[in-house]
Each structure stands twice: as structure tokens, then as C-alpha cells.
UniProtKB/Swiss-Prot annotation:
Family: Belongs to the class-II aminoacyl-tRNA synthetase family. Type-1 seryl-tRNA synthetase subfamily.
Name this protein carries in UniProt: Serine--tRNA ligase
GO cellular component terms, A-Z: cytoplasm
GO MF terms, alphabetically ordered: ATP binding; serine-tRNA ligase activity
Lineage of producing organism: Bacteria, Bacillati, Mycoplasmatota, Mollicutes, Acholeplasmatales
Metabolic or biological pathway: Aminoacyl-tRNA biosynthesis; selenocysteinyl-tRNA(Sec) biosynthesis; L-seryl-tRNA(Sec) from L-serine and tRNA(Sec): step 1/1
Keywords: Aminoacyl-tRNA synthetase, ATP-binding, Cytoplasm, Ligase, Nucleotide-binding, Protein biosynthesis
EC numbers on record: 6.1.1.11
Quaternary structure, from the entry: Homodimer. The tRNA molecule binds across the dimer.
Principal subcellular localization: cytoplasm
Species whose genome carries this gene: Onion yellows phytoplasma (strain OY-M)
GO biological process, one term: selenocysteine biosynthetic process
Length: 424
């Protein structure tokens, strides 16, 4: 969430920067008047409280002196009623301001290319060698069904479309990747956690999923607690420290979390709905960092390298792109996408994102640090990154490591986890 005072004091530049997202933010022009009305109400309330306190003292003094308190008590009651009315007005005014700020996205970083969608993202560099096949490569669905390691038909019988049953070496490959990723990031100083998969409304708001993306997540409607299914480990992991204040010498705090994620994926169509590229339920390894504001972009660059290491060790060809302003996530100031080359698409496809939300999520979650320079509490910066999406990594391995006979060579780094060098 953006800071109200900052938005009001810098309104033209804030709107100009936000409109690089190719959206209309004219509604923010309401904020200066709302902020002024709020300020006036606060002053009136402060004055009335002072009058009410003075009146209460007079009541006490007259009562102690055994004088008639009828008129003074009547004045006190009038002041109390007026105060309650003003406090209700203030509550409504603050809710109006809150509603505006809660749907307003983060300010994009100045380094981002200006654009309308992912077509305007900027390729930064490529890594790894794209394989030249001596045969026509198959897509992961064909390969997996021939090997009987992914079962879409039975998953559909259980749950409907957008689900899969991993079986045999398919299940073992998924598990091996999770273990490999968790081990790798753990060695790099990320503390391993397994958070809850059922999440409350406050947690979903804190990371920016609500209210904007209500239609993209799963809500447990029989719950009295406004519970949601985990859409990404980013949500529960960040909320570990909601309403907390860090000591500065503890930063950065780094977590790696493995969870199953659940998303509606509304509006998905075309080739992406074939196979496991876009699922309602999928496994993901997520990286989270709570950083000092002064070095959060250095931490972001290091997190990118940490995510890249997974692809490098798996020897998968990939590229890094910088997201344009039009493709940038709601809560993020800057995002790098990792895209792996998929032979069936003959192009690079997203396998992970690494982002800096600056203090946007920290403000919503009220996560701060004590600044020793001035002894004041300041919002930390929060980073999140994929480390990686497990299902899409399975796709990349099946397609890039396929053999002409339909078998799959297991990447060398996974062989100790899987206990074999070939899937057949």
C-alpha cells in the first residue's frame, strides 16, 4: 500500500508514474480533499475531547462540593454525543481513503521498460545451450502419457480439468525436484519452512491478493473465518512477521518455503491449458527476504542469481527478462522473469519471477525495523522469488532431456535424488 501523505504531497508525479502501468488513476485526485476532511475531523475530535475532559472535571468538582451538576452533566452528555457522531464520520472518511489506497498498485521502478503487456518486456541475457534435436521433439504431454508418469484422465475424473495425477517416476521426479531445490537454497542461507495452506483474509490483504484478485483465488465458503487456499507461499511466509518489528542487525531474513499452490486461472485458454503448464493445483518453491530499505535492490539481484542456479545446475537453457510497466504485478516495484526454453513451444516460457515490492507489502502487513540512526520504526523492504515452479521444471526436463525412443535422461544433479539416470 502506498503512503497517504506521500501520495497527496506528490500527487501529479505519483499519478504519472502509476499511469506507466497503462491504467487510469484519475480516482486518486479524490485523495487531497479526503485527506483534508480527515485532518479537519481529527482536529474537531481533538477539540471536543478536550472540552469533554474539562466538562467531566467540572462535574467531578461540583459533585465533590455537593453542588447541582445537572446542567454541567447535560453539557458533558451533549459533548459525548457530538464526539461519537464525529468519530463515526472519521471512521467513514478513513474507510473511503483506505478503499482507494487498497486498490492502488505499487509505483514501478524507473528502470522498467514502459509497455502495455509481456510483449514489451526486455530480454537482458540468455544462458545455456538450446539443444539441436536429430528428431522431431515431442511435447511433455505425449512423453508423459507414453511413459505412464502423468495421468490427466483420472485426475479429471477426480477433480475436473486443470489437474494431474503424478505417478511412478513422475511422482518421484516431482519429489526429487522439490528436495533438490530446497537443499540448494538451504545451503545459500535460506531458512526452510513449511507454512499453513489455509490462509485468513488479513494475510491475503497484506500481500496484495485482496481485494484486487478475489476472483483468482479459492475461498472456503463453508468457513466462518474467511479462509482461502494458499495461492503462493509468498502469502503465508510474509505473514509470518505481520505486525512485527525487526532489529536491524537481524536483516536480511531469508526463507525458502515449499507449498502446494491453488489458483483459479480464470480466462486461461489455448496451448497453456494442455498438460501441466497451467494448473489449478501445483507445487512451488518460493524464496522470501525481509531487507533493509537501503540494500533491497542488491538483495534482489542476489535472489535472481539464487533462482538462476537451479536452472544452471539442471543445465536447462533459459533467459532473464525485465518486466515492462504493463506486465508488472500489482504489489511489485520491479520484477525479473526467468524463462526456460521449451522445445514444444520453440520459445522461452516463464518458470519463475523474482520481485521487489519495496515497502508496499510491508506497509499493508505492518512489518517494520528499528532504525538505530534515529530510533524510529521504518518499514522494511520485502522480496519474493520463485525457486522454482516445480511443474514447469518437470516440463522443461521432459522436453529438453527427451530421447528419440521416448525415454528421458535424468539431469546429472537429480540422479542421486531419483536413484536412476533414465526415465523409461
Amino acid at each position: 500500500m502506498l503512503d497517504l501523505n506521500f501520495v497527496v504531497q506528490n500527487l501529479p508525479s505519483v499519478i504519472a508514474k502509476l499511469e506507466k502501468r497503462q491504467q487510469n488513476f484519475a480516482y486518486l485526485n479524490k485523495l487531497p480533499l479526503l485527506a483534508q476532511q480527515r485532518k479537519s475531523l481529527l482536529l474537531e475530535i481533538q477539540d471536543l475531547r478536550s472540552q469533554k475532559n474539562q466538562s467531566a472535571k467540572k462535574v467531578a468538582q461540583k459533585a465533590n462540593a455537593k453542588e447541582d451538576i445537572t446542567l454541567v452533566l447535560q453539557d458533558t452528555n451533549f459533548l459525548r454525543d457530538d464526539l461519537q457522531k464525529l468519530e463515526q464520520k472519521l471512521k467513514l472518511k478513513e474507510q473511503e481513503i483506505f478503499d482507494i489506497l487498497s486498490i492502488t498498485p505499487n509505483l514501478p521502478h524507473d528502470s522498467l521498460p514502459i509497455g502495455t503487456n509481456d510483449k514489451d518486456n526486455k530480454e537482458l541475457y540468455c544462458a545455456g545451450q538450446i539443444r539441436t534435436f536429430a528428431f522431431t521433439p515431442k511435447d511433455h504431454v505425449y512423453l508423459a502419457e507414453k511413459l505412464d508418469i502423468l495421468d490427466f484422465k483420472r485426475a479429471s475424473k477426480i477433480s475436473g480439468s486443470g489437474f494431474v495425477v503424478c505417478k511412478g517416476l513422475g511422482a518421484r521426479l516431482e519429489r526429487a525436484l522439490i528436495q533438490f531445490m530446497m537443499d540448494l537454497h538451504n545451503k545459500k542461507g535460506y531458512q526452510e519452512i513449511i507454512p499453513p495452506y489455509i490462509i485468513n483474509e488479513k494475510s491475503m490483504f497484506a500481500t496484495g491478493q485482496l481485494p484486487k484478485f478475489e476472483d483468482e483465488v479459492y475461498k472456503l465458503y463453508n468457513s466462518k473465518n474467511n479462509w482461502y487456499l494458499n495461492p503462493t507461499a509468498e502469502v503465508p511466509t510474509i505473514n509470518l512477521h505481520r505486525e512485527e518489528i525487526f532489529k536491524p542487525d537481524t536483516l536480511p531474513i531469508k526463507y525458502v518455503a515449499y507449498t502446494t499452490a491453488f489458483r483459479q486461472e480464470a480466462g486461461s485458454a489455448g496451448k497453456d491449458t494442455r498438460g501441466i503448464f497451467r494448473q489449478h493445483q501445483f507445487n512451488k518453491v518460493e524464496l522470501i527476504q525481509f531487507c533493509h530499505p537501503q540494500n533491497s535492490y542488491e538483495c534482489l539481484d542476489q535472489m535472481l542469481k539464487d533462482s538462476e542456479e537451479v536452472l544452471k545446475l539442471l543445465k536447462l537453457p533459459y533467459r532473464v527478462v525485465l518486466l515492462s510497466t504493463g506486465d508488472l504485478g500489482f504489489s511489485m516495484a520491479k520484477t525479473y522473469d526467468l524463462e526456460v526454453f521449451l522445445p514444444s513451444y520453440n520459445c522461452y516460457r516463464e518458470i519463475g519471477s523474482i520481485s521487489n515490492s519495496c515497502d508496499f507489502q510491508a506497509r499493508r502487513a505492518n512489518i517494520k525495523m528499528k532504525n538505530p540512526a534515529n530510533n524510529k520504526n521504518e518499514y522494511v523492504h520485502i522480496l519474493n522469488g520463485s525457486g522454482l515452479a516445480v511443474g514447469r521444471t518437470v516440463i522443461a526436463i521432459l522436453e529438453n532431456y527427451q530421447n528419440q525412443d521416448g525415454t528421458i535422461t535424468v539431469p546429472e544433479v537429480l540422479q542421486p535424488y531419483l536413484g536412476t539416470d533414465i526415465i523409461k
